[in-house]
Amino acid sequence: MRKLKHRTIKTNGINMHIAEAGEGPLVILCHGFPESWYSWRHQLPVLAEAGYHVVAPDQRGYGDTDAPKALEDYTQFHLVGDIVGLVDALNESTAVIVGHDWGAPVAWNAALWRPDIFNAVGALSVPVTARGAMPPTELMKMGFAD
């Protein structure tokens, strides 16, 4: 089993803690709620042994990554921007992205918005629902007020 390396990188205006292992094509593992990189501790060495450079960040507001105070700093655009910046900080141009639970929408949106970077996407433990009559943002406003 390979030893995990921990470090902090600057991305999208925040300091992001990452755990990483291995060499090869980049695979990014986005944790769920309320978790951290540690959720991927068993997958990191296995993927590294399989020939990948695997990275599990603490996402914005979790673990040892910065937690901006403003609620508006936690949009999908910010979260995906953090991951795009992570790819850049690692001097890579493409990556596979996998999300678990709350990390799945980050993975989906990263692949949707930046297909030039994210060439494959995986989502675990999250339901996919049929498109509703109302946009999800409108439903959230109704359920959570302003």
Residue ranges and their predicted role:
Residues 2-4, 15-16, 55, 62-98, ...:
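Flexible "cap/lid" subdomain of the alpha/beta-hydrolase fold that forms the substrate-access gate
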Residues 17-66:
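Conserved HGGG/HGGXW glycine-rich cap/lid loop of the alpha/beta-hydrolase fold
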